[in-house]
């Protein structure tokens, strides 16, 4: 072997990475040594997993407690008709194993909760959050921020999506600096009631995967401190700054020390 222990097949598979000065053999080796947890194997999780695996991220975890439904197939592109009724983590694992034998896949067929997230974070360097509910989003933010684990966030509805990255730096910012608490239950529709354009999660999920890859490489400028809003109907991107809040209950000066102080299944309030 040569080129930092990449074998002949890997040199061929990742050749378009390796010829880039910004990546090269050393960068590809960093990707192969990286471990990333993807929360959710649905609309956002599909492109996230697809591109992390193709890039050669060596260890990928998938956390999801759902099964494939036929209504998922319009946007959840790693699953097919034969997968209907199967656990999404199993379908996703098989997709990745067909795509890239270099990747070790760990499946976690469970809903991510305050009882298990800390153990999950211990196993991975980076988190990419493709969850579809506020409770999980706030939990991921709080747990990752307190543990110092960087994560990429994405959300979608109808024609619109949002995406950002939080590098879990001391002093923030974090998701709660922008949105201190979740909206009241029932005030914001979800994809099941309001719908979602089938291609939308592809765009947002690919940006999330890009952020995960850059974090693993240690190259480029992430969206830390910025949130991008994408409107597929108008084909526009807008960006806002996310400023650290000194009074943020998570990353602020007097922030909490444990996720167990939060009522995630209610309002995510602290």
For every predicted segment, state its role.
Residues 2-270:
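Adenine nucleotide-associated cytosolic modules
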């Amino acid at each position: 072997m040569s080129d930092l222990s990449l074998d002949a097949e890997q040199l061929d598979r990742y050749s378009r990475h390796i010829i880039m000065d910004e990546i090269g053999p050393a960068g590809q080796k960093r990707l192969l040594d990286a471990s990333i947890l993807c929360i959710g194997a649905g609309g956002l999780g599909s492109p996230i997993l697809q591109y992390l695996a193709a890039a050669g991220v060596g260890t990928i975890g998938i956390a999801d407690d759902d099964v494939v439904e036929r209504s998922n197939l319009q946007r959840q592109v790693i699953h097919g008709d034969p997968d209907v009724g199967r656990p999404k983590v199993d379908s996703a694992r098989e997709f990745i194993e067909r795509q890239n034998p270099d990747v070790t896949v760990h499946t976690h067929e469970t809903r991510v909760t305050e009882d298990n997230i800390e153990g999950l974070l211990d196993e991975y360097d980076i988190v990419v959050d493709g969850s579809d509910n506020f409770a999980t989003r706030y939990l991921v933010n709080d747990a990752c921020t307190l543990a110092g684990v960087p994560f990429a966030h994405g959300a979608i509805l109808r024609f619109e999506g949002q995406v950002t990255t939080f590098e879990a730096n001391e002093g923030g910012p974090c998701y709660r600096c922008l949105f201190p608490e979740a909206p009241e239950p029932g005030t914001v529709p979800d994809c099941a009631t309001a719908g979602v354009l089938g291609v939308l999660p592809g765009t947002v999920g690919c940006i999330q995967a890009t952020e995960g890859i850059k974090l693993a490489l240690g190259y480029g400028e992430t969206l830390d401190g910025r949130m991008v809003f994408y409107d597929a109907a108008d084909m526009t991107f807008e960006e806002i700054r996310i400023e650290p809040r000194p009074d943020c209950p998570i990353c602020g000066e007097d922030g909490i020390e444990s996720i167990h102080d939060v009522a995630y299944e209610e309002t995510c309030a602290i």
